[in-house]
């Protein structure tokens, strides 16, 4: 795994964060060192996908990057047939994913699409995964995507959503930021790397509160939802489409 040193030297000005070839080449290390409980989150998501997947439906991984969820899910499914569509707008990420799939027995079960997630026509899904993706969409497109996901899910289907979140109280938000910075320092990032990456992500990654996410899910039609994993300013959610309208 190539180490993330993208922000280790001073940059003036600091460029806006972009999912380019440089980021794609170190993304596994970046995720492990920047996203608390990342491995636990996607491991349990892969298990949930196995439990909720229905024959002859689709799993969508929207914002799939270089395929960590898909690789785990494929191994969890083993010999059980499944169909997955991975979508990402970054050509370098999709290319990395393709390379990883080449050696896997389940490579034909996963179709990769290089496009913006909001451009895709979704349908016949029993599982939709959206990991650290909604936060990069413009605010006016988020409601539409969640509504489209709800429509695409079969009754009883699930949405698995992980996001960086804001605390509604500014003093608690400050605590979250402090502990998140500590987490990154504990994982070997310098103060320069932390501050420059924060600047690079400003106005690129726009988080929301848990309450906003939950309200959006409810507006779309999800009547059952839960935060199943949370670490300060990161949260993983599950939302279930009713088996029957009004249930």
UniProtKB/Swiss-Prot annotation:
The chemistry this enzyme catalyses reads: prephenate + S-adenosyl-L-methionine = carboxy-S-adenosyl-L-methionine + 3-phenylpyruvate + H2O
E.C. numbers: 2.1.3.-
Q: What top-level class of enzyme does the UniProt entry assign? A: transferase
Per the record, the domain of life is Bacteria
- Annotated SUPFAM superfamilies: S-adenosyl-L-methionine-dependent methyltransferases
A GO biological process of this protein is:
tRNA wobble uridine modification
GO MF annotation terms: carboxyl- or carbamoyltransferase activity; S-adenosyl-L-methionine binding
Q: Which UniProt keywords apply?
A: S-adenosyl-L-methionine, Transferase
* Residues that bind S-adenosyl-L-methionine: 38, 63-65, 131, 198
The record's annotation in InterPro entries points to:
CmoA, Methyltransf_25, SAM-dependent_MTases_sf
By its UniProt entry, which Pfam families does this protein fall under? Methyltransf_25 (PF13649)
Function field:
Catalyzes the conversion of S-adenosyl-L-methionine (SAM) to carboxy-S-adenosyl-L-methionine (Cx-SAM).
Spell out the family assignment given in the record's similarity comment.
Belongs to the class I-like SAM-binding methyltransferase superfamily. Cx-SAM synthase family.
Q: How does it assemble?
A: Homodimer.
Q: What is this protein called?
A: Carboxy-S-adenosyl-L-methionine synthase
Species name:
Desulforapulum autotrophicum (strain ATCC 43914 / DSM 3382 / VKM B-1955 / HRM2)
Instruction: Identify the taxonomic lineage of the organism of origin.
Output: Bacteria, Pseudomonadati, Thermodesulfobacteriota, Desulfobacteria, Desulfobacterales
